[in-house]
Amino acid sequence: MINYLKGKILFSNSEYISVVVNNVGYKVEIVAGRIYNKGDEIDIYIFTHVREDSFRLFGFDSQNELNLFEKLLSVSGVGPKSALALL
């Protein structure tokens, strides 16, 4: 699983960023309201969410933020989208 990425931001909007690492682009869903600029170098902690029909990456600025996200996921009825919105 992907746990951490270090690369350059290729694209950014309010829902996700594209991070290029060794010429491979990763779409990473982010906390709403975060501002990232194209061309900036980024270190981002990743939660990898795998299901039968999808493979999604969620990105966080710190290990503590990632840990909080994982704790929110342990609450019954809270999925990745809800947990991300709560942050």
What role is predicted for each listed range?
Residues 2-6, 10-87:
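Long, highly charged, low-complexity intrinsically disordered interaction regions
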